[in-house]
Amino acid sequence: MITIIGSGKVGGDAALFSALKRLDDQILLLDVAEGLPQGEAMDINHMLSEQGIDVEVKGSNNFEDMKGSNIVVVVAGSGRKPGMTRMDLLKINASIVKSVVENVKKYADDSMIIPVTNPLDPMAYITYKVSGFDRSRVFGMGGMLDLSRFRQFIHEATGHSRDSIRALVIGEHGENMLPLPRFSSVSGIPLPSLLPKEKLEELVQNTKQVAAKVIELKGATVHAPGNAISAIVEAVVRDRKQVIPVATYLDGEYDHSDVTIGVPAVIGKNGVEKIIELDLNDEEKQVFNKAVENVKGALSGVEI
């Protein structure tokens, strides 16, 4: 069973995409708001009935119902409002995530946890520490969403098929993210061979800023994060051994320890099966290190 804690727009879309991909026979939507997960589940099930997809989506307000879950996605918390940064949400969401993870420990202690709540990297750290799970079983969704946005900008700039584009974004899921043109390509051709430096810099900045633009225009980002969640879940349940940037706990990798930050990792049935260390240049290291310090600084004022 896949459990998604938080039944708002992103949680609902994550359940929808996961059901359409048939990632499990049972998907549970959990939320403290009476009626919300039940109504969301009903709506999705009606769609699945027309599609002929035999996945059962259930809504509940009882944490005990997550017993037996293989994967728990944590989306619970307050979302960004126009003008807010992800870090503005830290104090609001830290206590919510801690409470949720305590319940995951109690009722689904064999599961993997995928934190999604913003600010993502600090929340992934809190999840890892509070759960006490092995680091392979706690990995946050951040870079997967960022690279989908980076891919879209590459598609718009080159005109090439989205399917031919491979992109990579690491670091903080926030203002200090690190889109990596050197490690991105179109049909195997390195991106710097296709676009001038000025254009690459423009794509990087657009990738960093586009979420705020979407929030300004429609109030929230919904479909892209919902799909990114399902893509990570799919890598686990299908044992894809797929290289995905996830927020995972570092213990010496990239010369950093005791921090959770976005890095490329092999994701399969055992969760984070291997962390891949890239040969970053000095400029890239500077941005990555700044992201690490930002996450550590944010957590310094949080009691775990």
UniProtKB/Swiss-Prot annotation:
EC number(s) on file: 1.1.1.37
Covalent S-S links between cysteines: none
Amino acids binding substrate: R80, R86, N118, R149
Active site as annotated: H173
Keyword Protease among record annotations: no
GO molecular function, one term: L-malate dehydrogenase (NAD+) activity
Key words of the record: NAD, Oxidoreductase, Tricarboxylic acid cycle
Domain of life: Archaea
Entry-linked Pfam families: Ldh_1_C (PF02866), Ldh_1_N (PF00056)
Family matches, as PANTHER family: L-2-HYDROXYCARBOXYLATE DEHYDROGENASE (NAD(P)(+)), L-LACTATE DEHYDROGENASE
Family: Belongs to the LDH/MDH superfamily.
Function: Catalyzes the reversible oxidation of malate to oxaloacetate.
Protein's name in the database: Malate dehydrogenase
Source lineage: Archaea, Nitrososphaerota, Nitrososphaeria, Nitrosopumilales, Nitrosopumilaceae
